[in-house]
Amino acid sequence: MEQFSLTDIKKKNLSDVYHYIYMNPSCSKQDIATALSVSLPTVSQHLTTLESEQLIEKCGRLSSSVGRRANAYQIISDAKIAIGLEILPHTTHILSINLYGKMIAKETLPVSFEASATYFSKLKKAVENFCQVNHHKDESILGIGLGVQGLISPDGSELTYGKILDCTGMSIDLFSDAFHVPCKFVHDAECACTSELWGNPDITDATYISLGYHLGGAIIVDGQLLTGATGKSGTFEHMTLVPNGLD
């Protein structure tokens, strides 16, 4: 039987309080205590901790017919953010999202891809400028997701097939070393499909098809992106049937 220390229990309770507020904005201390079956003093302690870490904030007072109106709490949605980069042959799209998946800012950078030190230097400076303009502090960035046109290893660490960018075998370490935050490759169509799921959480089963200069797609099953053991299940791609076309 797994044993939990007092510290483990406190961390779990703190996490539970935060996630309850995340899912139930404008909730009261009593709401949290009732929902999580913990004491009011315990909730108060965790609220103080989360406020001191600037992860939550008071957002007014709740209406009450008797007595003092209770404080309402919500998370600070941009206390932590994620950066998304779409790497294309001749441009790079960059955006930032908050903890609810809502876009904060976006920009298109005229940075053409090439597997060189010069490219990574340009990209790093462009991302740093984007973060500075939009007041994104380094410590608030949870990580960077890189949407690419190609097949990705199951753990997102390698571009296993990248004919469009001519970068098959490229490692995510090239980006992680440049940005010093966790980075991960994601198939571009899966990025778009995941965005649809964030915006429409009631979707259970669906097929996503991206029609542009290149064909792409993904499949949603039971409300989850279908990836399979190799990370390629549900991926829509095209293939050459006749090299150089028919005569």
Where are these regions (language model features)?
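Extreme N-terminal segment that seeds HTH/winged-HTH DNA-binding domains in transcriptional regulators
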Residues: M1-K29, A33-T34
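Conserved phosphate-binding catalytic cores of ATP/NTP-utilizing and phosphoryl-transfer enzymes
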Residues: K58-K80, F185-Y208
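Short glycine-rich, Thr/Ser-proximal phosphate-binding strand/loop in the N-terminal lobe
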Residues: F4, I83-A117, L159, K232-F236, ...
